[in-house]
Amino acid sequence: MAKKVVTVIKLALPAGKANPAPPVGPALGQHGVNIMAFCKEYNAKTSDQAGMIIPVEISVYEDRSFTFILKTPPASVLIRKAAGVEKGSAQPNKQKAGSISRAQLQEIAQTKMPDLNANDIEAAMNIVAGTARNMGITVTD
């Protein structure tokens, strides 16, 4: 018989740097999950992606055990890294924060493909380009 899922917790944590301090501790502690076990597992699985923010979906079961699924980094983080900017523009229509090439856009779309609701790479590129546009980052050919 399968274990019954009590709750699903979604967090976005820096890769390899999860610790029991907030937001991890309170989110997991209220469901009785072993916080240190999660932190060690998460850090081990994400240590190769240092510097990125990795979203994680934690399923907590009745017996207080857990499993988690790592997602791809948010498109905005990948776009900022590719453009080499600290943050997007506060007024994307008036001020541009930077630019990325079509090749960089395709690379980001390829990375995000498993988590995007797109059937092909072109659709994924359009989704990522929309995110870039909203951040004030232009896509050049």
UniProtKB/Swiss-Prot annotation:
**PTM field:** One or more lysine residues are methylated.
Q: Which GO terms describe its cellular component?
A: cytosolic large ribosomal subunit
User: Which residues does UniProt call coiled coil?
Assistant: none
Known PROSITE patterns for this protein?
A: RIBOSOMAL_L11
One GO molecular-function annotation for this sequence? Answer: large ribosomal subunit rRNA binding
Gene3D superfamilies to which the protein is assigned, alphabetical: Ribosomal protein L11, C-terminal domain, Ribosomal protein L11/L12, N-terminal domain
Q: Name one Pfam family in it.
A: Ribosomal_L11_N
Supply the SUPFAM superfamilies for this chain. Ribosomal L11/L12e N-terminal domain (SSF54747), Ribosomal protein L11, C-terminal domain (SSF46906)
* SMART domains assigned to the protein according to its UniProt record, in alphabetical order: RL11 (SM00649)
> Subunit comment for this entry?
Part of the ribosomal stalk of the 50S ribosomal subunit. Interacts with L10 and the large rRNA to form the base of the stalk. L10 forms an elongated spine to which L12 dimers bind in a sequential fashion forming a multimeric L10(L12)X complex.
Put simply, this protein is called: Large ribosomal subunit protein uL11
* Species: Picosynechococcus sp. (strain ATCC 27264 / PCC 7002 / PR-6) (Agmenellum quadruplicatum)
